Amino acid sequence: MFMQDSDSIGIVSARRVHFDTPLSLKSRAVLDSYELVYETYGELNPERSNAILVCHALSGNHHVAGVYADNPKNTGWWNNMIGPGKPIDTRKFFVIGINNLGGCHGSTGPISINNRTGKRYGPDFPLVTTSDWAKTYVRFADQFGIDCFAAIIGGSLGGMSAMQLALDAPERVRHVAVIAASARLTAQNIAFNDVARQAILTDPDFHGGDYYSHGTHPRRGLRLARMLGHITYLSDDSMASKFGRELRNGSLAFNYDVEFQIESYLHYQGDKFADLFDANTYLLMTKALDYFDPAQDYDGNLSAAFARAQADFLVLSFTSDWRFSPERSREIVKALLDNKLNVSYAEIPSTYGHDSFLMQDDYYHQLVRAYMDNISI
């Protein structure tokens, strides 16, 4: 039996919305129709002015808060942030979580059936970008009669998605919270993504992305990709504090088996992820990260790119995040200030690295709460 805490969303369920209007993508491909899976928390007010959209990161999904009745251990990935009395208070806001187009948790993506062929899309599913997602967010809002989001919020890739909506449809959002994100990937980050992709692409079970029809899954490649990614999400201090050089069995074995606790942890994370995620979706999501660069059409001038934005911004970074360092957030802040937009910025002390945006941290949560409390609905 599930025991609900007073500040918990409680039991939730996912829903699905179908779109028949063709969607033209940035790649020039067209989806004749598609579906998005989503969850909502709280109540949409009569004015439809209290909606908040939460955008997920690379491996995230629509299950942002609460638990499922048939799987109470599957807690939403931002459950510590969203709920009655929490920083994003569902007594005030109507919070929406969407599994992005191209995802593998119910929204149309590589594992979905292509109505034209009767088979899974697989590698034929077109690459999608944050601009494509922004289009789907607007269409989703239209389904609910939401003319303007009170806020759009996201961490990591989710923060990039939030920025994209603020640029592509500035009239559709009043506040934007960009957390542990960047206005573009550095060469180092693109390199990390490519190595992760190569681990999948060179897995013998990948079969050019058509592993579904072969009855296989590139588990080894996906596992390695996740292990690499997980290293970049942590900080050296957090790894040292949690694992150090601790051995699994207390002594060296003088072989190539897993000996150190950090190795065991990475193998566990890789195995768990490979059981839950689709490899084609992983490839697609890393490309969405690589392609995000709003300044590209403005000769690299980020300030010029943000001239379209109208919303107020909250930008947060974490001191130990070396994947999307505070310097990247300060670049965003400068571009916003150059356009005389209202922006609040904080660099939060943390030892957890990039994953800090998911953690329970009093100062971090106080900052989010204070900002959200000041949003009028």
UniProtKB/Swiss-Prot annotation:
The residue ranges of the AB hydrolase-1 domain are: 50-358
Its localization reads: Cytoplasm
This entry's Gene Ontology molecular function terms read:
homoserine O-acetyltransferase activity; homoserine O-succinyltransferase activity
Query: InterPro entries from the entry?
Result: AB_hydrolase_1, AB_hydrolase_fold, HAT_MetX-like
Q: Under which pathway is this protein filed?
A: Amino-acid biosynthesis; L-methionine biosynthesis via de novo pathway; O-succinyl-L-homoserine from L-homoserine: step 1/1
> Residues in the active site?
S156, D321, H354
A Pfam family cross-referenced in the UniProt record is Abhydrolase_1
Output the superkingdom of the source species.
Bacteria
Q: Can you state the subunit structure given in the record?
A: Homodimer.
The UniProt family comment states: Belongs to the AB hydrolase superfamily. MetX family.
Function of the molecule: Transfers a succinyl group from succinyl-CoA to L-homoserine, forming succinyl-L-homoserine.
Name the UniProt record assigns to this protein = Homoserine O-succinyltransferase
Protein source organism: Nitrosomonas eutropha (strain DSM 101675 / C91 / Nm57)
Q: Which gene encodes it?
A: metXS
